[in-house]
Amino acid sequence: LGRGSAAGSFILYLLGVTEIDSVKYDLFFERFVSKIRAKKTVIDGVTYLDGSLMCDIDMDVCYYRRKEVLRYLDEEFEGKTAKIRTLNTLSGKLVIKECGKTVEDKSETEMNRVSALIPKVFGKVMDISEAYEEVPEFKQWCDKNNRTFTNANKIKGLVKNKGVHPSAILLSYDNITKSCPLEFDSDKEIISSFNMDWSQMFNVKLDVLGLRTVSVVDQACKIIGIKVGDIDLNHESIYQSLYDLKHPQGIFQIEARAAYEACKKVKPKSLEEASAVLALARPGALAFVDQYANFTNNDVYEPIHPFFDDILGATGGVCLYQEQMMKMAHKVGFTLDEAELLRRIVGKKKVSEVKKWKKKIRDKIKENNLEKEVGDILWQVLEDSANYSFNKS
């Protein structure tokens, strides 16, 4: 049907790749592809674009039919497919821990404590150089134990072992031997010798994910004698079932405890409200479940500022989605590309970049003759929401 940022592409909807009308649901293409986010790599004088401009579309298929899909790709694109090599590197946490023990004979207990000071940002461990700038206690320890920190910086990122990507398939426009070196794995299957980043420069990466939930839906539709596309997503019986939900088992994502509890409070009556339940079932957003439920059940709206009512009104004054953050920045005067970049920078909390963008917001407020309070609220929402807001698509 459509899941992830690819659902923000109207072209994919028209092609039938997704069944989500991005215009109807107010989704942003810039959340899928953004010029500003693209990385540039120069090799032998030729500039290659990597990352954001390359479409990343995950495909969820029946768990028990995934091999069938892979076999189809191999046959349809004979000589043009391969699995993708992964290179697992030494993380900052690991090198700090091991260097401390070997270089300065620190205890396991102390190094466990020190490595725990390095935070995660968007699920990824922060680089130790960034942690040095951002975490005062970690900086203080590194200044006292400079040999450990210096050596850890030298070996971080080195390859420790290699593997195979669990879901990705490489697809070439021509015979794949022309675009990357290949090797065989232990099962005699073809794998790219390049890692994922290099392989994607010259080929397309497809993520084919086998989900048991898709298999359950497939079997249920076969038993009933319908297709998924036959289901009316606005039918009141769907939401009546969610309203009276007693057992969430088997309902994709809602079966998780946090989502189930949010669902019982919100009592969704539309696809938009059901989507909001999933967005609320995240660590930071759980604090807003009662506010949103009060909005859906009692029509109580808690505005943060009239300037943003048209953006946050549909979610009861709660900034649930990354697209809402982008809209707020856009309304202040930024382009949607800039708004996406701003969202990412605030989430990563890079001090130098944060200061720069704070000034840019102040400048936009003055340039467009807006109240200073509007800029303050925008920044506060960005800071509060960056770590929990959900991709609406």
Question: Which residue stretches match the model-derived regions?
Answer:
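Alpha-helical scaffold/interaction cores of sigma-54-like transcription cofactors
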Residues: 1-393
